[in-house]
């Protein structure tokens, strides 16, 4: 079974099924937890059907491959997220909060459910919630300390290369940001330039050892962890690499970790940052010399918990000590409790074992059989049912009540002998099967060091002699104001302060790779509320600067919004002004109050009528037509970037990815992967307008069907568009024409506005087409 499907089966009713790119609750992508390797003699064809192994052309509801391997031809690259379980939450408190929940959820695996053509997600607890590969998860921005910041646009760095020379053909902006590349210079680099020299030769030899296959598709890596050199130093990233039609598609994602860079000085291990010796009990007696000799171990926190850890060499005398904050993986066992499928790369990082296939699960989960028996006695293991982590905890406490417990939670045994407390979810696949090659149960294991406890422990493990850091209470107030001497005067907004110290934050709206977004007021006049976006100068890509005849050299976003201020449109956000200091640009836009973004609106509405869908979408199409008439492209059209005001006006916001067509053709794509056109993922150069149309098609599909049409890169590239139901013939025709994979046949924005679906509203007052905001 795919980790995406399992995640969807086991998501809690109180949790969202989609994460946000800004302002979301902390969530972790499950992309690294697909089962990677299988023993082909263990899994029968019947088992594959039960595990939802359908090709991308399958008519069934899900089209994921449960097992990805280096010689697989039908594997999919994961692009989804999952909610994190709070491992450290009090069991008693949790039980009280969920006392009225049934023992197991009412979700089943069945071919009838899979064949339900009207419901893409038959297993969801709340079918009115949506899933989307556009989900943006919180991952650490490259920095010396672990950070729980969400990354705007995409938490995944994506790059397309040749499968022979490994030269870079195209990449997304997040890849360029992480590695300091200009989009116009990508083709000068090989993908191996991002790796440490000592490791790049190892990886290149490994990839070259795979015979080239230009006719078939296969997964080379899935969830493997490799070191890379970012602009902020060496970091670990999860890798998924797929070979397809003579090219390699690479997806990179940061590992949630804390780390210490170590160097040896006269035989003493020293923290490179503090130049102080490390405590003697921190390191093993013998350090690895090569990547293949990397050490997997556990680290005990100050609170007594153990975290999975790793040590690997950077050079002969320098090393990196990693403490993993989060790990989760899916494995399958047969009726004899032998492991028959798992992601080996993941479990090696998590538990230090590289050979768990065919081993008894008791090797790593000694109480599993007792827990399973307890659940069986409660009739919780009917075929197809999923047992949540809280009920597994309850079963664990019950079955271990009469013996000395090693932990308050279910736990795994690391290869070094220490225990790692985890949460566990169990799905009953074929519990009564006696075939050794057929899965009886799927087991989802989750380790989560919540609230940066591992990060705090890294600081506590350093030598007691640590240099004190100076803390400045409000650095921004000390900075020199580089903007105009006089405050900006607007007829509506009166005097707008041009100093960040003059603003009071009302609410944090989001933190991204490029800066922050806040709802703020003037300290001198708190009646006025503004959206205040800070843009870090150090993180602006080289290709994102614009020489503006009025403003000088400024970020592209500011230049375009300044132009649109003079050429305004009622369905486009309006900039008030901007200013800067030594570190940031500050962009002020009008707040849309009262208002709600389209993402939340779709989530909260039980249904959206055709009239309402049409009114919302037509306004956004008008906004895009206005942009395209000035050769401006948005490049990040999605439901999160559409605000619905209380009066029914829909506005397009967030121009952080926008550009001008004259700067094209482009080889660096921006925005959200779930709304990316297939030609972008194929590494082709693009002009921009056609890609905005594709994103509009995804947006309309999302409004109508409450889900994204494509759940992974494979589907974006090849899958046939699935229409769950027909809202109207004209609506379906418009969606299909916008989502035409042939760029040259794709409808234009002018043709979109002239489509028959809009015949009944086209000649109304387009300045404010009222949306019937029904409850």
UniProtKB/Swiss-Prot annotation:
InterPro entries listed in its UniProt record: Kinase-like_dom_sf (IPR011009), PAS (IPR000014), PAS-like_dom_sf (IPR035965), Prot_kinase_dom (IPR000719), Protein_kinase_ATP_BS (IPR017441), Ser/Thr_kinase_AS (IPR008271)
For this UniProt record, give its keywords in alphabetical order, as a comma-separated list. Answer: ATP-binding, Cytoplasm, Kinase, Nucleotide-binding, Nucleus, Phosphoprotein, Serine/threonine-protein kinase, Transferase
Q: Which reactions appear under catalytic activity for this entry?
A: L-seryl-[protein] + ATP = O-phospho-L-seryl-[protein] + ADP + H(+); L-threonyl-[protein] + ATP = O-phospho-L-threonyl-[protein] + ADP + H(+)
Report the subcellular localization: Cytoplasm; Nucleus
What GO molecular function annotations does the UniProt record carry, in alphabetical order?
A: ATP binding; protein serine kinase activity; protein serine/threonine kinase activity
List of catalytic residues: 636
**In what residue span(s) does the Protein kinase domain sit?**
503-758
- The protein's Enzyme Commission number: 2.7.11.1
- Cellular component terms, GO, for this chain's entry? cytoplasm; cytosol; nucleus
Do the record's keywords include Cytoplasm?
yes
GO terms in the biological process aspect are: intracellular signal transduction; negative regulation of glycogen biosynthetic process; regulation of establishment or maintenance of cell polarity
Binding site residues for ATP: 509-517, 533
Per UniProt, the enzyme's principal EC class comes to transferase
What positions are modified (Phosphoserine)?
Answer: 132, 134
Q: Which family does it belong to?
A: Belongs to the protein kinase superfamily. Ser/Thr protein kinase family.
Entry protein name: Serine/threonine-protein kinase ppk6
Question: What species is given as this protein's source?
Answer: Schizosaccharomyces pombe (strain 972 / ATCC 24843) (Fission yeast)
Classification from the root reads: Eukaryota, Fungi, Dikarya, Ascomycota, Taphrinomycotina
């Amino acid at each position: 079974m795919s980790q995406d499907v399992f995640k969807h089966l086991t998501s809690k009713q109180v949790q969202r099924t989609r994460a946000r790119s800004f302002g979301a609750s902390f969530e972790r992508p499950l992309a690294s937890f697909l089962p990677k390797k299988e023993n082909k003699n263990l899994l029968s064809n019947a088992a594959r059907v039960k595990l939802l192994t359908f090709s991308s052309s399958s008519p069934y509801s899900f089209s994921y491959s449960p097992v990805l391997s280096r010689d697989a031809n039908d594997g999919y690259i994961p692009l989804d997220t999952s909610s994190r379980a709070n491992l450290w939450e009090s069991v008693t408190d949790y039980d009280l909060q969920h006392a009225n929940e049934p023992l197991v959820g009412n979700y089943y695996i069945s071919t009838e459910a899979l064949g339900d053509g009207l419901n893409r997600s038959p297993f969801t607890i709340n079918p009115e919630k949506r899933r989307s590969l556009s989900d943006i998860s919180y991952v650490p921005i490259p920095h010396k300390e672990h950070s729980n910041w969400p990354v705007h646009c995409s938490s995944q760095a994506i790059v397309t290369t040749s499968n022979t020379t490994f030269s870079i053909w195209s990449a997304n902006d997040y890849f360029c940001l992480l590695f300091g590349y200009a989009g116009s210079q990508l083709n000068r680099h090989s993908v191996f330039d991002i790796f440490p020299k000592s490791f790049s030769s190892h990886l290149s030899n490994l990839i070259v050892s795979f015979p080239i296959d230009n006719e078939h598709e296969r997964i080379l890596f899935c969830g493997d962890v490799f070191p890379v050199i970012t602009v902020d130093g060496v970091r670990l990233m999860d890798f998924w690499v797929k070979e397809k039609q003579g090219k390699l598609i690479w997806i990179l994602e940061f590992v949630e970790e804390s780390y210490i860079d170590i160097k040896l000085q006269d035989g003493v291990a020293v923290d490179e940052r503090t130049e102080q010796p490390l405590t003697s009990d921190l390191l093993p007696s013998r350090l690895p010399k090569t990547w293949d000799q990397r050490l997997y171990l556990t680290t005990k926190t100050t609170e007594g918990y153990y975290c999975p850890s790793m040590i690997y060499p950077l050079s002969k005398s320098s090393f990196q000590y990693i403490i993993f904050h989060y790990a989760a993986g899916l494995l399958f066992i047969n009726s004899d409790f032998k492991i028959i499928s798992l992601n080996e790369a993941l479990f090696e990082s998590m538990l230090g074992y590289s050979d768990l296939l065919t081993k008894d699960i008791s090797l790593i989960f000694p109480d599993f059989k007792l827990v399973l028996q307890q659940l069986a006695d409660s009739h919780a293991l009917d075929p197809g049912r999923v047992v949540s982590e809280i009920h597994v905890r309850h079963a664990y406490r019950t079955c271990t009540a009469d013996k000395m417990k090693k932990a308050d939670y279910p736990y795994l045994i690391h290869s070094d002998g220490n225990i790692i407390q985890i949460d566990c979810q169990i799905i009953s696949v074929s519990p009564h099967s006696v075939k050794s090659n057929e899965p009886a149960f799927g087991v989802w294991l989750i380790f989560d060091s919540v609230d940066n406890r591992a990060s705090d422990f890294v600081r506590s493990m350093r030598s007691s002699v640590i240099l004190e850091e100076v803390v400045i209470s409000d650095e921004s107030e000390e900075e020199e104001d580089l903007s105009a001497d006089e405050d900006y005067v607007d007829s509506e907004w009166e005097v707008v302060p041009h100093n960040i110290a003059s603003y009071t934050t009302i609410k944090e709206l989001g933190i991204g790779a490029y800066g922050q977004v806040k709802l703020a007021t003037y300290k001198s006049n708190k009646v006025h509320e503004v959206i205040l976006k800070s843009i870090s100068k150090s993180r602006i890509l080289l290709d994102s600067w614009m020489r503006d005849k009025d403003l000088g050299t400024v970020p592209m976003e500011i230049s375009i919004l300044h132009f649109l201020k003079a050429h305004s449109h009622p369905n486009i956000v309006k900039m008030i002004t901007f200013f800067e200091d030594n570190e940031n640009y500050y962009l002020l836009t009008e707040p849309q109050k009262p208002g709600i973004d389209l993402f939340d609106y779709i989530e909260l509405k039980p249904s959206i009528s055709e009239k309402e869908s049409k009114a919302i979408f037509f306004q956004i199409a008008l906004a895009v037509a206005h942009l395209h008439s000035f050769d401006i492209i948005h490049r990040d059209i999605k439901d999160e970037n559409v605000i619905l005001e209380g009066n029914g006006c829909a506005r397009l916001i967030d121009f952080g990815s926008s550009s001008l067509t004259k700067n094209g053709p482009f080889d660096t794509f921006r925005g959200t992967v779930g709304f990316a056109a297939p030609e972008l993922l194929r590494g082709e150069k693009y002009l921009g307008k056609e890609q905005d149309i594709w994103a509009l098609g995804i947006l309309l599909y999302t409004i109508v069907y409450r889900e994204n049409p494509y759940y992974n890169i494979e589907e974006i590239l090849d899958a046939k568009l699935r229409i769950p139901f027909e809202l109207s013939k004209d609506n379906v025709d418009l969606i299909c024409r916008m989502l035409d994979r042939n760029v040259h046949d794709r409808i234009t924005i002018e043709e979109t506005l002239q489509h028959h679906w809009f015949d009944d509203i086209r000649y109304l007052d387009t300045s404010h087409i009222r949306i019937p905001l029904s409850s």
